[in-house]
Amino acid sequence: MVIRVFLASSSSSVTIKKRQQEVLQFLEANRIEYEEVDITMLEEKRQWMYKNIPKDRLPAQGNPLPPQIFNNNIYCGDYESFFESKESNTVLLFLQLKARPAQKEL
Protein backbone atom coordinates (compact mmCIF):
# COMPACT_ATOMS: atom_id res chain seq x y z
CA MET A 1 0.00 0.00 0.00
CA VAL A 2 1.23 3.44 -0.90
CA ILE A 3 0.33 6.66 0.82
CA ARG A 4 -0.83 9.22 -1.74
CA VAL A 5 -0.45 12.89 -0.85
CA PHE A 6 -2.51 15.22 -3.02
CA LEU A 7 -0.79 18.59 -3.15
CA ALA A 8 -0.60 21.80 -5.14
CA SER A 9 2.88 22.51 -6.48
CA SER A 10 1.98 26.02 -7.60
CA SER A 11 0.04 27.23 -4.57
CA SER A 12 0.53 30.88 -3.68
CA SER A 13 -0.40 30.18 -0.06
CA VAL A 14 2.60 29.97 2.26
CA THR A 15 0.49 28.05 4.79
CA ILE A 16 -0.45 25.37 2.25
CA LYS A 17 3.18 25.05 1.12
CA LYS A 18 4.39 24.64 4.71
CA ARG A 19 1.72 22.06 5.51
CA GLN A 20 2.50 20.05 2.39
CA GLN A 21 6.20 20.12 3.21
CA GLU A 22 5.58 19.05 6.81
CA VAL A 23 3.58 15.99 5.70
CA LEU A 24 6.18 14.96 3.11
CA GLN A 25 9.09 15.48 5.53
CA PHE A 26 7.39 13.33 8.16
CA LEU A 27 6.76 10.51 5.68
CA GLU A 28 10.34 10.73 4.39
CA ALA A 29 11.87 10.81 7.89
CA ASN A 30 9.85 7.75 8.90
CA ARG A 31 10.59 5.94 5.65
CA ILE A 32 6.94 5.60 4.77
CA GLU A 33 6.47 4.96 1.08
CA TYR A 34 4.43 7.70 -0.56
CA GLU A 35 3.47 9.19 -3.89
CA GLU A 36 2.95 12.89 -4.56
CA VAL A 37 -0.08 13.70 -6.71
CA ASP A 38 -0.04 17.26 -8.03
CA ILE A 39 -3.62 18.49 -8.45
CA THR A 40 -2.54 21.71 -10.19
CA MET A 41 -1.28 19.91 -13.27
CA LEU A 42 -4.18 17.59 -14.11
CA GLU A 43 -7.84 18.43 -13.63
CA GLU A 44 -8.73 14.72 -13.54
CA LYS A 45 -6.53 14.21 -10.44
CA ARG A 46 -8.17 17.15 -8.68
CA GLN A 47 -11.64 15.85 -9.54
CA TRP A 48 -10.70 12.33 -8.36
CA MET A 49 -9.54 13.78 -5.03
CA TYR A 50 -12.74 15.82 -4.58
CA LYS A 51 -14.92 12.83 -5.47
CA ASN A 52 -13.16 10.44 -3.07
CA ILE A 53 -13.25 12.59 0.05
CA PRO A 54 -16.26 11.42 2.10
CA LYS A 55 -19.11 13.94 2.15
CA ASP A 56 -18.94 14.23 5.95
CA ARG A 57 -15.26 15.25 5.71
CA LEU A 58 -15.72 18.05 3.17
CA PRO A 59 -15.33 21.65 4.36
CA ALA A 60 -18.53 23.60 5.03
CA GLN A 61 -17.55 26.11 2.34
CA GLY A 62 -15.34 25.88 -0.71
CA ASN A 63 -13.18 23.01 -1.90
CA PRO A 64 -10.89 20.85 0.25
CA LEU A 65 -7.40 22.33 0.40
CA PRO A 66 -4.19 20.36 -0.02
CA PRO A 67 -2.61 18.38 1.37
CA GLN A 68 -5.18 15.58 1.34
CA ILE A 69 -3.91 12.14 2.29
CA PHE A 70 -5.04 8.73 1.00
CA ASN A 71 -3.85 5.16 1.54
CA ASN A 72 -4.14 3.97 -2.06
CA ASN A 73 -7.78 4.94 -2.73
CA ILE A 74 -8.90 5.10 0.91
CA TYR A 75 -9.22 8.59 2.36
CA CYS A 76 -7.14 9.16 5.52
CA GLY A 77 -7.66 12.87 6.09
CA ASP A 78 -6.45 16.41 5.65
CA TYR A 79 -3.58 18.31 7.25
CA GLU A 80 -5.49 19.01 10.49
CA SER A 81 -6.26 15.31 10.95
CA PHE A 82 -2.64 14.42 10.17
CA PHE A 83 -1.37 16.99 12.67
CA GLU A 84 -3.70 15.69 15.41
CA SER A 85 -2.54 12.12 14.79
CA LYS A 86 1.09 13.23 14.92
CA GLU A 87 0.53 15.00 18.24
CA SER A 88 -1.18 11.94 19.71
CA ASN A 89 1.39 9.53 18.24
CA THR A 90 -1.24 7.69 16.17
CA VAL A 91 0.02 8.45 12.65
CA LEU A 92 0.21 4.79 11.60
CA LEU A 93 -3.43 4.36 12.61
CA PHE A 94 -4.34 7.58 10.76
CA LEU A 95 -2.55 6.33 7.64
CA GLN A 96 -4.24 2.94 8.05
CA LEU A 97 -0.90 1.14 8.13
CA LYS A 98 -1.04 -2.04 10.18
CA ALA A 99 2.52 -3.31 10.03
CA ARG A 100 5.89 -1.63 9.72
CA PRO A 101 5.48 0.68 6.72
CA ALA A 102 7.30 -0.06 3.49
CA GLN A 103 10.57 1.78 3.23
CA LYS A 104 11.07 4.26 0.45
CA GLU A 105 14.25 3.84 -1.55
CA LEU A 106 16.68 6.68 -0.84
From Swiss-Prot:
Keyword check for Nucleus: yes
Molecular function terms from GO: SH3 domain binding
Location of the protein in the cell: Nucleus
Signal peptide: none
Assigned keywords, A-Z: Nucleus, SH3-binding
Major localization class: nucleus
Pfam families for the chain: SH3BGR
InterPro entries, per database record: Glut_rich_SH3-bd, SH3BGR, Thioredoxin-like_sf
GO cellular component labels: cytoplasm; nucleus
SH3-binding, short sequence motif: residues: 61-67
Record family assignment: Belongs to the SH3BGR family.
PANTHER family: SH3 DOMAIN-BINDING GLUTAMIC ACID-RICH-LIKE PROTEIN, SH3 DOMAIN-BINDING GLUTAMIC ACID-RICH-LIKE PROTEIN 2
Record-given protein name: SH3 domain-binding glutamic acid-rich-like protein 2-B
